[in-house]
């Protein structure tokens, strides 16, 4: 895992925690941490994994500081593939905003639980852009 993503267990429940202020953007560090945490969770004795985030947002999408730079693996598509093929149920605990790639990530989880004030969306479509990982498919 990375400093931005941690994995812990309590009993038979695993928790992947994203903590990458200010908005938990999907930076290379977060993407790598998610893949590492999913790999750890897949092989332990837990029955379910919860994906949650610290701070005021769930995940607010791409890290704009990485725009214009060469892409680095794991890509968002790689992370989403890891979620979709995860062998145990995974629940996204959504608060704040889940935008763009953050919403796509939540949609790849088996279950989504959102607080009443949570907001989700694909703002890139308002600019005539397709979501980066196929969120409209």
What does each of the following model-derived ranges do?
Residues 83-132:
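Glycine-rich beta-to-alpha active-site loop
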Residues 23, 56, 61, 117-119:
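A short, glycine- and basic residue-enriched loop/turn
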Residues 33, 52-82, 98, 126-129:
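Glycine- (often His-adjacent) and acidic-residue-rich active-site loop
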Residues 16, 51, 63, 105-106:
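Hydrophobic/aromatic residues within transmembrane alpha-helices
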């Amino acid at each position: 895992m990375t400093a931005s993503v941690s994995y812990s267990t309590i009993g038979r429940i695993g928790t992947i925690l994203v903590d990458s202020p200010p908005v938990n953007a999907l930076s290379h560090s977060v993407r790598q941490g998610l893949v590492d945490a999913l790999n750890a969770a897949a092989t332990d004795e837990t029955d379910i994994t919860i994906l949650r985030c610290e701070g005021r947002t769930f995940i607010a999408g791409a890290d704009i500081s990485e725009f214009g730079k060469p892409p680095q693996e794991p890509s968002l598509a790689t992370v989403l593939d890891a979620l979709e093929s995860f062998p145990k149920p995974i629940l996204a605990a959504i608060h704040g905003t889940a935008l763009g790639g953050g919403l796509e990530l939540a949609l790849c989880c088996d279950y989504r639980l959102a607080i009443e004030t949570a907001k989700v969306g694909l703002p890139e479509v308002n600019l005539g852009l397709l979501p980066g990982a196929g969120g409209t498919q």
